[in-house]
């Protein structure tokens, strides 16, 4: 039984609609066996993505503003390769997304760890000279809270003051469980300060590995060149299939179908954190995504707990690896993307029993 943040249950994906779209793509490929394809991505897929994110996330863009990538990680890589030079100052949330930090460091950047609070990134801590700011404003990773409206405006103002580009990683944004969803930060951007990154790998299937970036014109042209030099273009069959999948409304149906499943799992974990697990942990009230974070109360050894839980076949994951600087806030990431509803109580019973033995 795993409470992994990374894994997703594949049984929630309807194979019939996906297979029909893939068959369509195979038939289409036979009609264009020697056609050259744009590094930017197929126009029909970019049109479908632009329509989807305008409706779902309030993103202002057209198909010409989009670059199709092999997942969000390649989108981050291409943007960073275009903008980051050795010694370049990059700011990102702490705690934050380790692969983004590792990417910036690998390209020679100086990465500043900016603390977060209940309203998100603490903008006043962004250092002078920063050229790139990486944030997850809709659903802070890993803690889960959204960035407040005043903080969003402050971030845009600070980026304009610095002449910096903001990378908005809008991961896990499709699944929201209560309250109105805040639009993407990019919607507030009137000056081309935001590069918006998204992916279908988490919403649909991890194996899909298709993501996208909405980029300011100056960045887009260079990123398309970098994409071409990297791998020419993302897999054409998958692009045709996904364009069809989006165009026929299957994504929205999938989200509506899965929402009830994930919502029930989330509510069950919250109920346990608010009852018999409350002497040891307090939940951060995140309202979107596929995981919850729970902060440990004084005296709880999270690393020991995670190790002991694995011995009773429960996968637990500590918050510690997501912090780059002290003070680390001890706690757990509790993913509900892969675990079945009926397995949550048995898994958390074992966690509770382990905590009682440690107390």
List the model feature ranges, each with a label.
Residues 1-40, 51, 311-314:
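N-terminal "arm"/small-domain region of PLP-dependent enzymes with the aminotransferase-like
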Residues 4-5, 113-115, 134-136, 167-170, ...:
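Short beta-strand segments
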Residues 22-162, 173-175, 180-191, 195, ...:
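Conserved core of the PLP fold type I
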Residues 92, 113, 168, 242, ...:
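Hydrophobic residues in well-ordered beta-strands that form the structural core
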Residues 190-193, 198-260:
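Conserved core segment of the aminotransferase class I/II
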Residues 215, 293-298, 316-356:
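Conserved PLP-binding active-site segment of the aspartate aminotransferase-like
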Residues 260-270, 281-295:
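Conserved glycine-rich beta-strand-loop-beta hairpin in the small C-terminal domain of fold type I
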């Amino acid at each position: 039984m795993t409470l992994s943040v990374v894994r997703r249950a594949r049984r929630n994906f309807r194979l019939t609609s996906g297979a029909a779209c893939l068959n369509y793509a195979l038939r289409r490929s036979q009609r264009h066996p020697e056609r050259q394809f744009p590094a930017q991505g197929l126009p029909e897929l970019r049109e479908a993505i632009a329509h989807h994110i305008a409706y779902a996330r309030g993103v202002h863009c057209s198909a010409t503003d989009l670059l199709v990538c092999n997942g969000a990680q390649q989108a981050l890589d291409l943007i960073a390769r275009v903008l980051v030079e050795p010694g370049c100052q990059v700011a990102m949330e702490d705690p934050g997304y380790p692969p983004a930090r590792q990417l910036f460091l690998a390209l020679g950047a100086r990465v500043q760890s900016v603390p977060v609070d209940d309203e998100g990134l603490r903008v006043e801590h962004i250092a002078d000279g920063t050229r790139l700011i990486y944030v997850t404003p809709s659903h802070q990773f890993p803690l889960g809270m959204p960035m407040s409206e005043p903080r969003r405006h402050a971030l845009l103002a600070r980026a304009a003051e610095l002449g910096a580009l903001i990378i908005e990683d809008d991961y896990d944004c499709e699944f929201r469980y209560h309250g109105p969803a805040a639009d993407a930060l990019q919607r507030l951007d009137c000056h081309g300060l935001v590069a918006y990154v998204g992916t279908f790998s988490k919403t649909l299937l991890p194996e899909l590995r298709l993501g996208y970036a909405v980029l300011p014109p100056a960045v887009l042209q260079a990123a398309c060149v970098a994409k071409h030099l990297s791998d020419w273009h993302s897999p054409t069959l998958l692009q045709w299939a996904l364009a069809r999948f989006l165009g026929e409304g299957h994504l929205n149906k999938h989200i509506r179908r899965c929402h009830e499943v994930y919502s029930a799992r989330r509510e069950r974990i919250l109920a346990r954190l608010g009852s018999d697990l409350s002497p040891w942990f307090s939940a951060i009230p995140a309202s979107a995504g596929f995981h919850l974070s729970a902060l440990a109360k004084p005296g709880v050894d999270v690393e020991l707990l995670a190790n002991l839980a694995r011995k009773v076949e429960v996968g637990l994951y500590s918050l510690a690896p997501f912090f780059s600087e002290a003070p680390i806030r001890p706690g757990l990431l509790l993913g509900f993307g892969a675990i079945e509803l009926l397995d949550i109580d048995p898994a958390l019973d074992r966690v509770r029993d382990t905590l009682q033995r440690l107390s």
